[in-house]
C-alpha cells in the first residue's frame, strides 16, 4: 500500500526526521497565509509530479492562493488531486537521494544513496549511486552509513547518518517495503531536510 506524501512526512516527523512545515488543504478556503511564499504540491499516488506540473513554487501569499485554486482537482497521470500539501519554501543548497527497500534478489533490506537527488534521479550515472545490504538481524550501524557516505564528497555527514538511522528504524518498525526521500536536501542554513516522501507499506 502506497502512502501519500503528507502521510509519509507525518511518519518522518514522528521519528524525528526533519520535514518542512506544512498543512494539507482540500479547498481554497483552507489555504494558509504565507507572506514569504511556499510550495504547493498535488497529493497523488504517482511519481513525476514535478515534471507533470503538479508542484508550484510560489513567491508570495497571492501566488500560493492561485496555485491552490489551479492545482485542486488537477489530474496527474490519471490521478485526480483531491488534496494539496502547502509547505514553507526551503532554500536549497544541495539535493541528495536516499532509499531503503527490500532487495528482491536476496530478500534483505538495502540502503541506496546518491549525492545527486531530485527530479532527474533516473538519469544519474551508476557510479554516483551506492547500495549496501543490511543484515535484518543486526540492523544498521553508524559506521556502515559513514563508510557509505565516505564515497562521496559531501558535508554534514553526521546529520545525514542520523537521518538514515532514524529512517531504518521507521522502515523496520512499520514493516515497510520502500522508504524513499528524494530529495533529501541540505539547506542554505546547513540543515538536512526531507523534502519529499515515498513510502510503501506491506499489504499484509
Indicate residue ranges for each PLM-predicted region.
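ATP-grasp fold ATP-binding core
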Residues: 6-8, 12, 35-50, 78-92, ...
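Terminal amphipathic helices with adjacent charged low-complexity linkers/tails
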Residues: 185-204
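ATP-dependent carboxylate/phosphate-activation module, predominantly the ATP-grasp catalytic core
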Residues: 53, 110-155, 198-204
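Preference for protein termini
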Residues: 1-28, 32, 36-37, 82-84, ...
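Glycine-rich phosphate-binding loop of ATP-grasp-fold ATP-dependent ligases
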Residues: 20-22, 40-67, 97, 119-126, ...
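Glycine/small-residue-rich loop that forms an oxyanion/phosphate-binding "nest" at active or ligand-binding sites
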Residues: 67, 72-77
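A long amphipathic alpha-helix within ATP-dependent nucleotide-binding catalytic cores
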Residues: 141-184
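Hydrophobic alpha-helical hairpins/lids featuring a short glycine-rich hinge
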Residues: 78-131
Amino acid at each position: 500500500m502506497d502512502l501519500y506524501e503528507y502521510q509519509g512526512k507525518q511518519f518522518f516527523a514522528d521519528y524525528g526526521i526533519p520535514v518542512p512545515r506544512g498543512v494539507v488543504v482540500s479547498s481554497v478556503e483552507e489555504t494558509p497565509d504565507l507572506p514569504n511564499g511556499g510550495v504547493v504540491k498535488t497529493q497523488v499516488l504517482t511519481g513525476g509530479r514535478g515534471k507533470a506540473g503538479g508542484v508550484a513554487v510560489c513567491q508570495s501569499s497571492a501566488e500560493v492562493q492561485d496555485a491552490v485554486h489551479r492545482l485542486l482537482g488537477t489530474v496527474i497521470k490519471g490521478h485526480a488531486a483531491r488534496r494539496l500539501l502547502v509547505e514553507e519554501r526551503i532554500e536549497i543548497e544541495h539535493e541528495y537521494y536516499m532509499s531503503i527497500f527490500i532487495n528482491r534478489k536476496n530478500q534483505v533490506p538495502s540502503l541506496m544513496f546518491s549525492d545527486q537527488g531530485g527530479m532527474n534521479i533516473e538519469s544519474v550515472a551508476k557510479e554516483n549511486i551506492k547500495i549496501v545490504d543490511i543484515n535484518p538481524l543486526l540492523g544498521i550501524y553508524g559506521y556502515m552509513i559513514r563508510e557509505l557516505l565516505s564515497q562521496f564528497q559531501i558535508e554534514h555527514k553526521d546529520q545525514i547518518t542520523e537521518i538514515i538511522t532514524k529512517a531504518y528504524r521507521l522502515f523496520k518498525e512499520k514493516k515497510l517495503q520502500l522508504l524513499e526521500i528524494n530529495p533529501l536536501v541540505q539547506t542554505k542554513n546547513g540543515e538536512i531536510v526531507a523534502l519529499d516522501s515515498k513510502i510503501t507499506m506491506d499489504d499484509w
